Amino acid sequence: MHFYEELVMQTQRVYSQYAGIYAAGGTPYVRTDKPPLPYPEQIARLVREIREADCVVVGGASGLSAAGGGDFYYADNASYRKYFGKYAEKYHFKGAFDGMMHHWDTREEFWGYLATFLHTTQTAPLRAPYIDLQALLQGKDFFILTTNQDTQFVKLYPEEKVAEIQGDHRFFQCAACCTDDTWDAVQPVAEMVRAMGPRMAVPTGMIPRCPHCGGEAFPWVRGYGNFLEGKKYEAQYEKISRYVLSHKEKKVLFFELGVGRLTPMFIQEPVWHLTLAFPHARYIAVNRQYNFLPKELEEKGMVIVEDIAKVLRDARAQAGKGGNTA
């Protein structure tokens, strides 16, 4: 087991122990009572911390994509209607994940929905917050850790710079995990969507199959399937573990973006531990809803409670003016 994976396992045990607190949207960690800086000063500090850091570890979660329009997972909103309109009208789903939990009458209908879902993320253009983040990281030594499966980061950066610890919509695996192999999902998904047209079911012969056992395939993602924790999965943890351990004596900035209350054990809480443990580490989080900064980190960290797209846009503009050392 790799170093960062061990951290995740430790924080998962905390999550299990205090499940009720997390379910209520809280945290068992003692939070700082230190008042936040005014917003302009927070932006100036963010720009300064990025500039002065030797390296930046970005922890990108669902709130980052949601801030750029990828907010169709949990709500029947304009984005959901744009991409899943026919399903919203017929089934009245309250977001994309609602459809994943639906008991479909046929596998052809299930795959019609799943192909629509995967095609939406696979073909989505780069969202504005990612572009602004890229500008902020220009010229920096950085690494990306993400729980997002929507392929936004790998559209920007080479795979050696990104650890996708919750999977990736570009790949299929055997649904029964009969093999450790993963394979391309992009072309089969495009072909299913093209063959389906306005209908809501794929042809039977197009249902993706495992090339080894002949059973159904499934996207290589955690959340609603039998997630394959094999060589590709371990490679993600190896990348982030190697990066943080090789930079532990550096002035590393852990930059958390959009972590919610369902999965704090994958990015947020391990990063808290690393910030506390590494002598020169700093921590900044941006979250539109939650102001969770442990008291132990109040001198090493900051949380900006604001729309992530706005924060990254404002920080990029500030950095473009030469920043602010205030």
Predicted regions and their residues:
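Conserved catalytic alpha/beta core of Sir2/sirtuin-type deacylases, generalized to analogous enzyme cores
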Residues: 2-326
